[in-house]
Amino acid sequence: SAIPAKDAAGYFRLPVDRAFSMRGFGTVVTGTLAAGSVARDGQVELQPSGRLLRVRGVQVHGQPAERAIAGQRTALNLADIEASELSRGMVLTEPGRFRPARSFDCRLQLLPSARPLRHGAPVHFHAGTAEVEAEVRLFPPARMLRPGAEAFVRILLREEQMLWPRQRFILRQFSPVITIAGGEILEANGRRYRRGESPDARLSVLGSGDWSAVLKLLVREAPLGLSLADLIARTGLTPQELAIASGSTKLRWLADGEWLTDPDQMEALRRKLLQAVSDFHSAQPLQPGLGKADAKAAIAPGAPAFFFDELIATSPELIADGTVIRRRGRQVVLQQPEEDASERIEAAFRQAGLAVPTVPEVLGASGIDAGRARAVLQILLRSGRLVRVTDTLIFHAAAIDRLKATIETRRGQSLDVAGFKEMSGISRKYAIPLLEYFDRLKITKRTGDRRIVI
């Protein structure tokens, strides 16, 4: 029969029904390819362990082939694993696309011939080639499901299994071992519901087949949106199918289709960020802006860098300035006490030349408290009037420029520490840090105990 294009184009999944060792070949697994395709020399992921394996060879219906596609009876010759490490019920998948689960929410149909199914009932779960013990959890207030009834149910598995959305399964009772129910997986590792909250409306959307509605639900439940990998794992759709489903919504893709967001949630985050930056400007008038790292931790913890950058870039009132965020047009304006302190601090370093005092000494003589003095110092550093050479050594820019000009007159020549001290008239205390500073600027290059002036 014809293979549905959707299955053949999807992500590779092969439930293992047999694994054995063949002389001259090594480890072989067989099964019916459930979705996607697999090629010789490709890489696959063994679920639920997550182990990556290489495909040495492919057979389709007993004949060697370069590739197998969905619906075909397939045998794979695998490298780097023993047959004893594989068993029926495991699944080979496309690497990085699926995650195993210990529970799932589903739409369950109890057979009319079955006994009433009680909350907490032990059952056998069967899906693909997997069989595992499980427990039925009915959502409150239900305590029992009557024969022939249909309901949304949570199934807890004794062992992790590879599950995917829309996967069909059956349940069998423990004794006698007969089929009692069947269903469709809606969500693996389902969310926790609050006391008194009914999952019916949410699970109805997940099981509706309306993928636009499903995407809106999932993305709006996530404060920052969801990655493409998360969406694939939670819906079973390909990137192309996700793009089509999102096309009829207001949802927006970021990072070239790697992240899906809700514009309304983005706008709410922009408002929070604007308020945080405004509050920071009011509380710290001498600081240029709120640190990006601090803002991200407060507003969007866990967000990828591109998400936060997009948040700033699309805010008409904010701008990223190096490592800080500030309001557009906002400038630090010094009051008279800070202006006087700025002049004292700059004069102290300018007059010192290359024999600079310690930073605490200069700040202590600034005429303002230590906190404001440090803020004024940062303003002078950002303006380029002062230059930080190390954490504890700061020089006036004019002194550094004069020294740089002197060094550059020796371009192509070598220079040792003693020669540098003699040339600059400074002690070793300042000479070593300054030479390392010029190394970083690529004005000099260290070779052993000497420097070459580049």
State each model region's role:
Residues 1-114:
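Conserved catalytic-core segments of large NTP-driven translation/proteostasis enzymes
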Residues 80-388, 396-443, 452-453:
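C-terminal effector modules of nucleic-acid-centric enzymes and ribosome-associated factors
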Residues 446-447:
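C-terminal accessory extensions/subdomains outside the catalytic/core fold
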